[in-house]
Amino acid sequence: ADPSLDYSQVTRPRALPLLTEFETSKGKEWLWTTFSADQIDLNFSNPKVLLTMLEVLLNYVKHGARFIRLDAIGFLWKKIGTTCMHLPETHQVVQLMRAVLNLAAPQVQLITETNVPHLDNISYFGNGKNEAQFVYNFSLPPLTAHAILRQDASYLSQWAAGITPPSS
């Protein structure tokens, strides 16, 4: 990554540096670290990285995975001059993963995880057949726990009534 570029439009989930300098076999390099310096982002625009991650995906399947969660997927693709959130290329990578799984292991389900507004979250269903089979919803677990513990589902019901189904 080039620290001289303008990254002001990039959505930041944390108030930590977006780029971190690391010592590599090629000398010092700046790497993209969306969440923190201990979590380096992968460059999915590099075909070698993309193919390696597809191999990792299939290795999970080989070892019995039935559900695969794509954590913070909205941040996957980097494009200077954008928010770097929910870019078309990100959806294309999810579609590619789904296509690979449909061929190699159709029983395996993809779950996308994005802590974002509902409509952005459900965009990872794609057309209903080409992206994730499930999207993780951050509001649902605490509201469900609250309803069970309080024996009162009013907050859960109120929240659910405001959700637009993906088919709408």
Residue ranges and their predicted role:
Residues 1-63, 76-78, 82:
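Substrate-binding/active-site clefts of carbohydrate-active enzymes
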Residues 1-9, 103-168:
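Conserved alpha/beta catalytic core and glycan-binding cleft of carbohydrate-active enzymes
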Residues 20-38, 89-95, 123-139:
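Short, charge-rich amphipathic segments
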Residues 41-121, 125-129, 142, 146-147:
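Active-site neighborhood of glycoside hydrolase catalytic domains
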